[in-house]
Amino acid sequence: MKELAKQYDPSQVEDRIYQFWLDGGYFHTKADPDKKPYTIVMPPPNVTGQLHMGHAVDNTMQDILIRTKRMQGYAALWVPGTDHASIATEAKVVEAMRAEGLTKEMVGRDGFLERAWAWKTKYGNRIVSQLKKLGSSCDWERERFTMDEGCSEAVKEVFVRLYDKGLIYRGNRMVNWCPHCNTSISDAEVEYEEKDGSFWHLLYPVKETGEMLELATTRPETMLGDTAVAINGEDPRYAHLHGCHVVLPLLNKEIPIVCDEHADMTKGTGVVKITPAHDPNDFEVGLRHDLPIVRVFTYDGHMTGAADKAAADALFAAGKNTVNEPQVLDCGKYAGMTTLEARKAILADLKEGGFLKEIEPLKHEVGTCYRCHSTIEPMISKQWFVKMEPLAKPAIESVEKGEIKFVPERFTKNYMNWMKNTRDWCISRQLWWGHQIPAWYCDDCGETVVAKSAPCTCPKCGSAKLTQDPDTLDTWFSSALWPFSTLGWPNEDSADLKYFYPTNTLVTGYDIIGFWVSRMIFSGLAYTGKAPFDTVCIHGIVRDSQGRKMSKSLGNGIDPLEVIAQYGADALRFMLVDGSTPGNDMRYIEKKVEAARNFANKLWNATRFVLMNLPEDFEPGLPCEELLDMSDKWVLTKLNQVAGAMTDNLEHYEMGLAAAKINSFIWDVYCDWFIEIAKPRLNSGDAQQADTARRVLVYVLDKALKLLHPFMPFITEELYQALPGSAETIMTQAWPTFDAAHNWAAEEEAFEKVMDYIKAVRTMRTEMNVHPAKKTSMIIETADAAPFQNAQVYLAKFAFATDVTFTEKYEGSTDGMVQVSTHAARGFIPMMELIDREKELARLNKEKAKAEKEMAMFGNQLNNPKFVERAPAALVEEIRSKFAKSQDKLANIEQSIKALG
């Protein structure tokens, strides 16, 4: 029998246990026709990232599900992997090169990619090793990377298929441009931040009438690119200006006044400036009115100059411009300024010219890059796009039909809003690290060739001069294929794909429903004909103890690895789920981690106690029913109930409720009550009773460890292996389930009557400061004496009774008696010589107030028709029972007060 250390030290256990699991191959899963598959794909963290609390909660939840299903007999596969994270990784490599005095352009594309792969090799295993520290039971033999050979093949296959179907196209469109990262980003990657700003009220002179048109803008620096002013055609204030022009201040250029519904008569003056190259709404107005598109910003956030204009003019002169190709303005004195520098200079010139009427302060939402938080510039740019409408329709229908459900259900609305309002997806990025777009352009005739491999010649003119598009695909393009590309797709004969796909549960945060979840759903349906998973389990974010989002700027981030080093991975995992509810944010509270650590210590010490009381020749196994006493049947019934309830909780992704139940069972039921109750039997001269107590102790502990294992895998494995008769690992043991044969409701109720009475006596003695050594006789008045008569050994030890008399109605003298009351019994204990009568009355009145409060609470629930009609019948019945018990208890207390006079 394995001997346990006196104290539990996670640092001495966790790494050793994890290596034991790896060496045993327990995480590896194969297709098994005799088992039902259960598959989770890990949301791939950035390959060069570090474990944060978001990863910790996400992977803890996945591990709980996968360990539970493994124990339930499923072929449970958890596919791990990492994401190449184009923007983040490229930024890291560029930063490292900058320290060497190098730029991307200096080393060239091949040289840069060589450095990027070296960076990935150096730092790529960091996040994986950190996930292992957390206890993640992934099938590491199947670890994938979004740029590995298989995933890259899937990306090219999808791109070519969509292009051939006309669902991928290239064109000049309004995109979200990050001038810092120097790339386009998708709508989903724009984060909105409230910032202080201004409405600058400008005056544009009307050429035909000489009057001034007032309009307001938050971006005066864009005015150089204005190509029209819009009014609403129904606005009577400006009916006389239809067909007129304004003279653009500073440039002295005529631009038309157009009538368009974009101009809202109810807002401001009802006049808006139109800059088609730098505002998505203005771009649409420009298309409707065939306005020129004039770009005034460079892609790195400066004002355009002569060189920029010359390059654009050359493009037009050569006939290489495409639809919606913007003209470029030489901004003259403002050329080369940053956009903010230009704003100040332009406003100063407008003021000097009499064109700035007033400045109105305001707070407004400003789009920022989700990576670097720079302000996003709407820009016309030639990019690759995916047509979303044909792909979104079946993805919407799949969720509407219930093929995919969101937990909690309320997040279905987030998904639907995103899918129903999505624009075409900009998938090209001006980066070098990532999947290079599989498109080539003929240098001689300009033909575009899209193929999975490089073409030798142009199919149109036969030229061998072909240049591949330098851009890469949006990172989310490859991660959208993750549920099936990791299982062998596009090889549809893959055994893994046939067996493990579709996957079952996706666990993720609500912040990437648009980024990722929606794209996986439409991708799975479009390319495999099947929804990629049946359930999306949404969790919230981990906030600090004050409820604030963790961030570098606040300096309130918590490093999970530091928590693990101090408290152990099990304590961190348990804290993250205990009390949590699906979809809701949670707070990191150190005292909760300490409580989880204390729970682990409690379990360790309880197991040591049990093991120390086992003989060397002990053989585990539950005794026959005839040998079980009331307390045995009580604890086995409680265990049975917990197993059933936890199974139901986990089926509904209520991990917080399941964690709370096993915590309460182990701490309150097993450690605080059953072990204490078992001690007299262990130490008695009755060998049969002692053996029964030992067998029940070990049986219940074994089952409790299995129920706790998905939540706290390390300590449960260590303790399980110390139990006599244990198998090689707890991981592959059967999950405990509800067993009707171990459901002794009558004995449970009877024993809880005794427990309630003992608790009442002990509470009274504590409040009265009566020393445990001072024992007394007692009279118990009860209509059901049998449970108390069968528990006299417990009354003696835990209620400090020297002898007990039972009666249905006590009518004797109460002089010198202290009285305790429960719903099932009233105790009369001769202790007045040890206590103060006034104190006893005060205690009873305190108990009375407590009972009245309980009765009122339960009564209010039962008097609420909505509760009675809508709550589950079992819950209503439970409240009725509690109400009746509180009534009985109150009546007993009132009798006791009356008896004291």
Name the predicted role of every residue range.
Residues 1-234, 275-288, 292-311, 343, ...:
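N-terminal, positively charged nucleic-acid-binding surface of large information/translation enzymes
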Residues 34-42, 64, 100-103, 128-135, ...:
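Active-site-adjacent bridging/hinge elements
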Residues 54-66, 73, 82-83, 151-154, ...:
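Structured ligand/cofactor/substrate-binding pocket environments in proteins
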Residues 67-75, 96-109, 129, 133-138, ...:
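Secondary-structure transition/capping motifs at alpha-helix termini
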Residues 181, 251, 372, 443-445, ...:
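Short Cys/His-rich metal-coordination motifs, predominantly Zn2+-binding knuckles/fingers
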Residues 200-207, 244-249, 367-371, 440, ...:
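Short acidic-hydrophobic surface loop/beta-edge motif
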Residues 201, 417-477, 481, 526-569, ...:
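Feature 926 captures the class I aminoacyl-tRNA synthetase adenylation module centered on the KMSKS loop
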Residues 391-409, 497-499, 853:
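Residues forming anionic-ligand binding surfaces in small-molecule and nucleic-acid pockets
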